[in-house]
């Protein structure tokens, strides 16, 4: 809701506002639980359509896409990056 509000408010200034909502990512966040605990890692991988836990590069690639000039028409969107965990 905030993303869309800000996109509408800032759109006339030619400022696009988008957000990303990452799923489970293997990082140091949370003490590295997803990355370092094989049971947690497997449990998460088993409920994603892609069958794996996300990597920081997965999120970075989506953000790089949003920053590219070719994405200039994307505005007010929250992009879920979860490997299909929510399907």
Regions found by a protein language model. Name each.
Residues 48-59, 70:
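A conserved structural motif in NAD(P)-dependent oxidoreductases
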Residues 1-9:
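Conserved catalytic helix of short-chain dehydrogenase/reductases
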Residues 64, 75-87:
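Short C-terminal tail/terminal secondary-structure segment
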Residues 12, 24-47:
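A glycine/serine/threonine-rich, flexible loop-to-helix segment
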């Amino acid at each position: 809701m905030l993303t869309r509000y800000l996109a509408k408010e800032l759109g006339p200034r030619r400022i696009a506002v988008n957000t990303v909502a990452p799923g489970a990512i293997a990082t140091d966040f949370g003490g590295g639980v997803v990355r370092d605990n094989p049971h947690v890692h497997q449990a998460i991988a088993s409920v994603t359509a892609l069958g794996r836990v996300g990597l920081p590069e997965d999120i970075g690639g989506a953000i790089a896409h949003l920053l590219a000039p070719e994405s200039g028409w994307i505005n007010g969107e929250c992009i879920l990056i979860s490997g299909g965990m929510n399907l």
